[in-house]
């Protein structure tokens, strides 16, 4: 990478981190700890060069793999990456942009070949050591072979349709005024919703309060706060709770 950067007269920054050590220290998966380490590296680089945004090279093939990966983990809907996301790293905001999300790997390779631009692949992407890599290297090629066609375009189309549906549902929920003045869910109103709308309302509330990895199973447990009077508290990730008290549902 350094040689390529020098060839094109570009600045380069490299970093090294022991992901297995981070897994032992923090208890996270390999994917989670590697992602957190990357975000920390990006934040350090942004601070060094006084940048407010960092551009990433995720492309359409990566997006399809992400949607499939999240679906198999039990995500709520067909969840993929967003063009722009903001993360908190050591108490400071880091904005990540993905301008190539609608561009396929094939299109990128064709562009590089047409312009005779040398590039470097990340060698770790060819190793079947993570779930995502195995999806890319084993599962997706097998599905392509079974169906006799490339499956990524179909996954991407389904994800776009799902996102449009979620946006429409969000508009409907916003008009229903489901929150009290303190921003808590008002139980008498949310209890009247259909199960599908109620799950969407809870999902929106959790997401707005920074809850990650919102699965179907988690939403089902959160719904029990509304349907089962005997339940008053649900465990959330990162040591937080969703509680029901005085006809209000809120995070603590």
Task: List each model region and its residues.
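Core alpha/beta nucleotide-donor-binding catalytic domains of modification enzymes
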Residues: 1-137
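Internal, active-site/partner-interface "lid" segment
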Residues: 125-133, 153-163
